[in-house]
């Protein structure tokens, strides 16, 4: 045992363990190898098994075929009569018949399914219509019931008051009835002058009710003057007892109505307690007479909508009769003033619901909605009325019993929580600014004002590339752009506008229709007045000042024919007729009689003035130009330094005038480039001398596709002519040709001794000679003309171009040895000459420099730390190609050369592909080069390799560029870095950028190098669950690179990459000394730009949330009027949405401090959601008190969900009539800059409003129907207004308003107004196309007479 123990002790167990582990490891290696071998063997056996099974199946199939063949051969030999074949044919026909039957049954089944689906859809539509009708009907009945209750209550009170008056009448002598009680506050009486004088009111019009009974004598009612005076005495008594403080005013009002002779019409003008409206109105008016559209005036006497009386009713004897009468009120038509007694019951607070003819229907609908909300949130009656009702109970017990028996059941009302009702009640009078100290208010005022009036930066010119500040006019209710540059007062001729004064408001009285003369008067027919000359010939209407029937417009038109065309010769062609001309100072349309005669255009006020001196004259010579925008209903006649904006009364007359002027000037109308369609751009262009039939002319030439165009100048967009090049014979000729000698003898002598000559000889046409200045230009034109003609001249062009031509002739045969030609493949050495034909030696030098830049980009490895080196190289090279389009094909050829047959050096080849990936979204090469690039990309496309994936990415980029067009700016740093440091082929959208929202969140959206803003927003809306911008009104904005508080709206056709690049470029120009990388990046914001009330029903939750946060931002910035109390309530709602329920603060310890977390949160809420003007300069005690009140308001919202808070917030905010409007700070141009008077210009769906900058009270509102012209005028914003015709004088006023604003704000204001006008026009046209039964019922028509259509203009 001892020996065994010694042996065991002598064993080294550690070495033993290591040896065993080594053996185990070797065993595992052997086992893994065995498993691998076994797996390979099994896989091989399985593959062999599959192959064997496949062979067996093939063999079985062959055996079956052979057996069938043997059977057929046997059957044919046995049955020689062919009965089997006949049976086979019968079976085949049966199978075909079955198939046809099955197909017929399937078609019937599909038809039945479609029919069932259509029937179900029709049923659903009918159900929806029925539901909508029932809802509208219930709302109407509920409103009618509410008003009937109110009317019944008022009638009961009147009966009770009359009973009391009768009782007092028996006890009081008649001499004491008209004595005014002592203590009655005196009021200014209403003057008995014109009917539109204002009636003084109390400062709180919502709590007063003016009840006036005005009896009018009619047959069967009052038979004598005594009865009339008695009724008046009773009414005076009743009125003095119910409202003793208003007795004198009511008496004066009655006497005033009696003097006017129309007691059924009451013209009132609610007084504004704020002095801003009156003073602003007085400062604007420069001439007497006429009313301004949009002003808060009542309906004039005799005008539509001015009757405030109830229809004829019989005197009720009991309350039951009065209830029946009131119930019958809405179904009876209104009768004239001389047929019945009228009882006028007017609520002064609701006087604004009565619209003048110039007011818009949308305001009336808003008032109806407010009334509906008031009925929903109806609280208990005021205590004063309750006490009055209690005092009358004892005197009318029987009447109340009768009333209770006949009173309908009270409809169920939706009752809001107490705190919500309190917010709504506060909102009814809280849409105004609270008073603050003058120092604080001025600080807040100028904090929001001057920043908006700052001078614009350089970025605005880049974002709005061609459109600096446009000018729009209203034609047929639509906003039509007539100029893309601001107006200059003298640019349009001033011969007919000498009487106007260039000031802030210029007024031009215009005559309206004479009431004594009509279109059908015998005098007009006798004098030969044409109907078409006095009214519109097409679907246009004539402006009010253009359709006057004064004597000077009634001359016979046979004196000078309306349209006379005697010859096609320029000097002999004559024409005359009416055109609408834009005035030079007051930018509005004026109807003038134009005469085209002897190469001149003369215009007069009327045809009768042709014997006098013309108001203007235009000489039509070779310097004249006709400009017409695409699909525009206006055109510009440019002569020298003057531009005449003209339009006709119908599209046919407009086309006729343009055609005549075009024939006279022997040029086509200049407009947008119609020949560059589908992304096609000129292959080569330049100044050439064209010689044909011995006549030479220096023209601007461009080769587009296979057509040669020539223009008068490089600025023209319509050619003088064109020449087809397809199959033409192109060659260079010596200078001994006749046309050359004739040209030199002509003395033009510009290219006398060094020019080259090319001839273009199309089939079946005479040859045309081109005289070219230099050899480089000649080579370029010769090569591109030869390629366009389809020639195969091997000696034309460079060697590279000749090889591409040969490949095209071989249709890109992949086995052609030309693909491996040394000229087409990679070369390590630099180029000695350009690969393409270039028109000048300077461009050839640039091509060689471009190749060196590409070589540096390709051969230097890209590192993340020094990526800016490659960014600068790529941007510089591509910027050169954008500046010189001739080099765009050159850089593609250079990159294709360096990619083809390149040695396998990974990073160099990848960087070459990356540079190509940067080129593809920017621009494309021309024609045959583009074909060659596509062939090369197809040859390299391979999803298994990295270079092949780059080729596939470049293919997609080329196709996208062909679809969406080329870019305008070089790639941005973000774009270059994304291509260099990320693999773009792994993503369908290789770039991404965050889009910020008003609530502080953001959404990352992907895009590619060709994505437009419309495509970008479509992806954004899909990811966020929002509607398209045409419905939601949202738009994409960028911040300003200068850091100022400016935002720039991006148009839908702009490309995202271009906007980012221009932003970065502007930032570098503003900070040239900083590093290339920089720390700032562009910030994209998605905000509401246009607000449409008709689209409110379809709002999504996300839209409502963003709209609430945007409104909160406007409140904080001081661009939304709310009182301090209402601002606190709304800030608490936003705090509940943003942070949830307010946590109860924990009590501090014995030696602790009060909780600072809650205080910090409250301070943060006040900073984010409470108006700055109410916080700035406030003492600390007031701020602490404000925080305590905020905590109380916030705690009351415990448990309220964010969607519920958003609903309440928007309901409150929408009580401001200008909710959704965009406010722009501006300064009236008639004031000197030292005065520093700033106003708000509010642009909304209904029109343009001018607001006081300090109080935000509306001074005046101009509906879009009164706006004729708007946009830039020099450096200011111009607004031309046509007022409503005055009914007494029949004249209108043309007012031109100008405001000082920054150029970006002017552009944004103009574009926003145009968007609103076109949207309103489209909505009106859509509703007009609907059947009458489907049109929504206008609630305004239930109470007021509809506004009748005026005889004004539909054109303006």
Swiss-Prot record:
Residues 179-203, 256-314, 354-414 are annotated as: Disordered. Residues 362-377, 385-399 have a biased composition (Basic and acidic residues). GO terms for cellular component: cytoskeleton. Residues 572-666, 681-790 form the PH domain. The keyword Cytoplasm does not apply. SMART domains: B41, MyTH4, PH. Residues 826-980 form the MyTH4 domain. The keyword Protease does not apply. The modification Phosphoserine is found at residues 451, 739. This is Pleckstrin homology domain-containing family H member 1. The lineage of its organism: Eukaryota, Metazoa, Chordata, Craniata, Vertebrata. The gene is Plekhh1.
